[in-house]
């Protein structure tokens, strides 16, 4: 097996496959949409990032189908390198060639700008609907909901200029997520995503209008928790809006 892979269930390539199956069952990465990447924070080189490829059924993904990059953005390994000219999955046509996820530059932005340990991109219907209900807004806000406490309280360190977690958000806090407009090609979202990350240091996610959401965290498990918590809050927000209940309590 390549030095980039391991049989350990906690290895990033194996975790991506596990999470893709889970997210598929949640309806977040259907039809080959969405993507996951994990930085090998506990490995010998914490700058190594594993990224799920483009155009693959996420629930059928295999570890060796991952692309491997090194921050700030060099591709070290392609699944085409080990395929002998044929795909690694019997699901794919023999002429299939693996392509890096179109999310790759956006994932790398989260790692380079926020020192993230994992970045998740889903096509959650709750995320899409929330951006449609508030189509005239450039940010999504919500307060006084218990689930907000699952999200990190982030601040800019005055000495380093880096965004750091200083605790967890509290019940009375207001969650604010930036909303950026979608583009015809995923990679064209990169500049808007980077601007949102810069302008919203307290956010751990960016909504993409009529598209989905990008969520990151300091570890893969934190990113998973943040993604689940935000999706819960977005689903609740849709119901509150339909019932005429303000999302931010005065």
From Swiss-Prot:
Source organism of the structure: Clavispora lusitaniae (strain ATCC 42720)
Catalytic reaction list: 5-(methylsulfanyl)-D-ribulose 1-phosphate = 5-methylsulfanyl-2,3-dioxopentyl phosphate + H2O
Chain residues that bind Zn(2+): 121, 123, 211
Keyword Cytoplasm recorded: yes
Cellular component GO terms held in the UniProt record: cytoplasm
Binding site for substrate: 103
InterPro entries given in the database record: Aldolase_II/adducin_N, Aldolase_II/adducin_N_sf, MethylthioRu-1-P_deHdtase_MtnB, Salvage_MtnB_euk
Cross-referenced Gene3D superfamilies: Class II aldolase/adducin N-terminal domain
Protein name: Methylthioribulose-1-phosphate dehydratase
Cofactor(s) the record lists: Zn(2+)
Record keywords, A-Z: Amino-acid biosynthesis, Cytoplasm, Lyase, Metal-binding, Methionine biosynthesis, Zinc
A biological process term (GO) from this entry: L-methionine salvage from methylthioadenosine
Keyword Cytoplasm part of the UniProt annotation: yes
């Amino acid at each position: 097996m390549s030095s980039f892979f391991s049989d350990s269930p906690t290895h990033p390539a194996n975790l991506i496959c596990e999470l893709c199956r889970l997210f598929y069952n949640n309806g977040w990465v259907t039809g080959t949409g969405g993507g996951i990447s994990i930085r090998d924070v506990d490995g010998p080189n914490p700058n190594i990032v594993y990224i799920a490829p483009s155009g693959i059924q996420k629930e059928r993904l295999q570890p060796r189908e991952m692309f491997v990059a090194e921050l700030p953005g060099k591709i070290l390994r392609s699944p085409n390198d080990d395929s002998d000219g044929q795909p690694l999955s019997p699901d794919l046509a023999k002429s299939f060639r693996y392509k890096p996820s179109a999310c790759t530059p956006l994932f790398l932005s989260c790692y380079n700008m926020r020192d993230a340990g994992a970045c998740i991109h889903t096509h959650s219907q709750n995320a899409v609907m929330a951006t449609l209900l508030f189509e005239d807004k450039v940010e999504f806000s919500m307060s006084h909901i218990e689930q907000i406490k699952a999200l990190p309280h982030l601040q800019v360190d005055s000495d380093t200029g880096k965004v750091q977690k200083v605790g967890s958000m509290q019940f009375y806090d207001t969650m604010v997520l930036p909303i950026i407009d979608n583009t015809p090609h995923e990679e064209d979202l990169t500049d808007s995503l980077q601007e949102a990350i810069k302008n919203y240091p307290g956010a751990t996610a960016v909504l993409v209008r009529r598209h989905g959401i990008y969520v990151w965290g300091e570890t893969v498990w934190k990113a998973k928790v943040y993604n689940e918590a935000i999706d819960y809050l977005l689903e609740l927000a849709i119901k509150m809006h339909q019932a005429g209940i303000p999302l931010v309590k005065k």
